[in-house]
Swiss-Prot record:
This is Polyribonucleotide nucleotidyltransferase. Keywords: Cytoplasm, Magnesium, Metal-binding, Nucleotidyltransferase, RNA-binding, Transferase. Residues 684-753 form the S1 motif domain. Belongs to the polyribonucleotide nucleotidyltransferase family. It comes from Corynebacterium aurimucosum (strain ATCC 700975 / DSM 44827 / CIP 107346 / CN-1) (Corynebacterium nigricans). The gene is pnp.
């Protein structure tokens, strides 16, 4: 990557407009993409949804328009020990000039894309609220207008942050979000980062990142603290690399983050300026800290020594059982010391303080001793288990284990007509590769609801899908719809990255010719002051507890050559660039080790299962598509009925044929070719035909789909004269015939012959 391109500062600008007559205030951020033009993000308040706590209409250029509102309940929620923030994205189909395709012709449950947008908003927005808030807060983003070539999700991050800034809620400064695409072309062979890429730019991007952050003070200067990253390689990145384009590696991520910061800064400045001019006064809300300082001190004194020993138990279940039992003992011992609190509140505070003490012990030992709960070093990976071909009738299956995390991967192949049709406001209309992730409650030894996927499951499935998508073969090379299911059977740290590994194994087992195998690893980071100096320790292959106790977790997936997906969330106000670089290198080493272990079991596609459909393709002239389909689908349906094969026709004339056996597929191909790529029959050729129609003067016999001939009544009786055609043959009868003549108009005359 070009350091020059990464460090060049865009010429962004922010301006404000106030219309006193209508009570409308605007903030306009103009973002400079250099040779790729500019994008304009406009925030407007005062016209729509005036009764909401905070309301902002956000525009991307002219045609994409979102309404964001933030509203809080008047009273805190009783019995809640967490902040009840909900984020909803409402896709209105009128935004794209469409009527919903559902039976009732109105919007129903949110699309997958809307749910993923909710998660993108929630992750950076939630940490900005003051700790201890228990009033219910609801952020609703409604898509009112949508340019069909644009994406609204990152615009929604900014809109949700802006409406929250105006709402009078106790929050820190605004959050800015930007999608960055690395585009390499003849003019920019090493790539240029482009903010808010449209769909055309998205499809040719080498790498793409959604980055959210906020402005923090670093001395006298403003800096941007990165809060969240979602990243992935372009769909065609493998081919682009072969053509000479730069591979997206660890340095690409660092450069992309730096390139995003000026855009985030401009977006935050626009929101802050809007808030200065139009925000409500911050209201007083009751806060409920998880525990008092006196409670923490008492628990620390009573429990820390024994906790240090209990936290060395390597097994998750044994460790959890031991610490939970000890927590009950500590609670029983201390609860009477806090008679100024009611019993329920005292119990809650003691338990929260116990967990906080446990967290501090783990963090301190990591920083000072390099100690981890299960005894590993900071760069060690847990024991790996790899197996394929577990499920008898599945087209491909695998089991991937990393410590106590256990993922079952299952692959199903089908015809292209089974690819998912997407009815949402994104430019993507269909998906050939579908990745579904399930996280049942028993995976953590608990009970709970099962059934339709929760937001977390949808998000994890999307991350794993993004990790695999760059290595999925093209539809021309592998004309199948692919459904990959990841079943989290056991969970103790990063089931999403375990799903990536299990999917590679399962896809190979199903015979899918991946461009390269992909593995994923979850990383953590712990920071703190040791001997007067700030220290950062990156952890490889984090446990669930290390995820909860750490300052940052990021998941990295990729091949041995390039990164395919990355997800990062941090609680820190900025990560030093050298710390992030070292952590990414540590992740690459772990990824390589996992790929080596996987390759010992399977390193290339197996033969396809005999239970998987056989799909072949043939190309026909576009002007023959109608003839192949036939009136009301008559011809194509006849091919399906006669051969047992399914036939799917693409707009470019590619015909995909799926059948249970090779013989059925060959028969269907012959039928298709006889219609669309015909070779005229010759006099003397014999066919076993089907009588399709009888008339007074003879019987019409189908030789091949779309090509019939006539047996005259005089030829049906042999040497005998017959009065009625139906005395000899009826519709549906099979009859052996020979072509006697073909006239100038192509009409075929047939005569019955004895079967050979």
């Amino acid at each position: 990557m070009s350091a020059k391109n990464a460090k060049k500062q865009p010429n962004n600008s922010v301006e404000f407009l106030i219309d006193d007559d209508y009570g409308i205030t605007e903030a306009i951020a103009t973002l400079d993409n250099g040779d790729f033009g500019t994008r304009t993000i406009r925030f407007e308040t005062g016209q729509l949804a005036r009764q909401a706590g905070g309301s902002v209409t956000t525009y991307l250029d002219e045609d994409t328009m979102l309404l964001s509102t933030t509203t809080a309940s008047n009273q805190p929620r009783e019995g809640f020990d967490f902040f009840p923030l909900t984020v909803d994205v409402e896709e209105r189909m009128y935004a794209a000039g469409k009527i919903p395709g559902s039976f009732f012709r109105r919007e129903g449950r949110p699309s997958t894309e809307a749910i993923l947008a909710c998660r993108l908003i929630d992750r950076p927005l939630r940490p900005t609220f003051v700790k201890g808030l228990r009033n219910e807060v609801q952020v609703v983003v409604t898509v009112l207008s949508m340019d069909p070539e644009e994406y609204y999700d990152v615009v929604a991050i900014n809109g949700a942050s802006a409406s929250t800034q105006l709402s009078g809620l106790p929050v820190s400064g605004p959050v800015g979000g930007v999608r960055m695409a690395l585009i390499a072309d003849d003019k920019h062979p090493k790539g240029q980062w482009v903010a808010f890429p449209n769909n055309e730019q998205h499809e040719r991007a080498l790498f793409e990142m959604v980055v959210a952050g906020r402005i923090v003070k670093k001395g006298r200067k403003d800096d941007v603290a990165i809060m969240m990253v979602e990243a992935g390689a372009g769909v065609n990145v493998a081919e682009r690399i072969k053509e000479g384009a730069p591979a997206p590696q660890e340095s690409t991520v660092a450069e992309g983050l730096e390139a995003a910061k000026p855009f985030i800064k401009s977006l935050c400045e626009a929101q802050a300026g809007l808030a200065e001019r139009a925000a409500k006064e911050t209201q007083e809300f009751p806060l409920f800290p998880p525990y008092g300082d006196d409670v923490y001190a008492a628990v620390e004194k009573a429990a820390s020594k024994k906790l240090e020993k209990l936290l060395t138990i390597p097994g998750k279940q044994d460790r959890d059982d031991a610490t939970n039992e000890y927590m009950e003992q500590v609670e029983a011992k201390l609860i009477e010391d806090f008679d100024d609190l009611d019993e329920a509140d005292a119990s809650k505070q003691i338990r929260n303080a116990f967990n906080a003490v446990m967290k501090d012990i783990v963090r301190t030992k990591i920083l000072t001793e390099g100690f981890r709960i299960d005894g590993r070093g900071v760069t060690d990976i847990r024991d790996l288990g790899v197996e394929v071909d577990l499920i008898p009738r599945a087209h491909g299956s695998s089991l991937f284990e990393r410590g106590e995390t256990q993922i079952l991967g299952v692959t199903t192949l089908d015809m292209l007509k089974m690819e998912q049709q997407i009815d949402s406001l994104t430019p993507v209309e269909s998906k050939r590769y579908m990745h579904h992730y399930n996280f049942p409650p028993y995976s953590t030894g608990e009970t709970g609801r099962v059934g339709s996927p929760k937001r977390r499951e949808i998000g994890h499935g999307a991350l794993a899908e993004r990790a695999l998508l760059p290595v999925i073969p093209s539809r021309e090379d592998f004309p199948y719809a692919i459904r990959q299911v990841s079943e989290a059977l056991g969970s103790n740290g990063s089931t999403s990255m375990g799903s990536v590994c299990a999917s590679t194994l399962s896809l190979y087992n199903a015979g899918v010719p991946l461009k390269a195998p992909v593995a994923g690893i979850a990383m953590g980071l712990v920071s703190g002051e040791v001997n007067g100096k700030e220290k950062f320790v990156a952890l490889t292959d984090i446990l669930g507890a290390e995820d909860a106790f750490g300052d940052m977790d990021f998941k990295v997936a990729g091949t041995s050559e390039f990164i395919t997906a990355l997800q990062l969330d941090t609680k820190l106000d900025g990560i030093p660039s050298h710390v992030l670089a070292d952590a990414l290198e540590q992740a690459r080493d772990a990824r390589a080790a996992i790929l080596d272990t996987m390759s010992e079991v399977i390193e290339s596609p197996d033969e396809m299962s005999g239970l998987a459909p056989r799909i072949t393709s043939v190309t026909i002239p576009v002007n023959k598509i109608g003839e192949l389909i036939g009136p009301k689908g008559k011809t194509i349906n006849a091919i399906t009925e006669e051969t047992g094969a399914d036939v799917s026709i693409e707009e470019d004339g590619t015909v995909y044929i799926s059948a249970a056996t090779g013989e059925a597929a060959d028969a269907a191909i012959d039928r298709v070719n006889s219609i669309a790529n015909p070779q005229l029959p010759k006099v003397g050729e014999r066919f076993l035909g089907t009588v399709v129609k009888t008339v007074a003067f003879g019987a019409f016999v189908s030789l091949t789909p779309g090509r019939d001939g006539l047996v005259h009544i005089s030829k049906l009786g042999g040497d005998e004269r017959i009065e009625k055609v139906e005395d000899v043959v009826n519709v549906g009868d099979k009859i052996q015939v020979e072509i006697a003549d073909i006239d100038n108009r192509g009409k075929i005359s047939l005569v019955p012959v004895e079967e050979d």
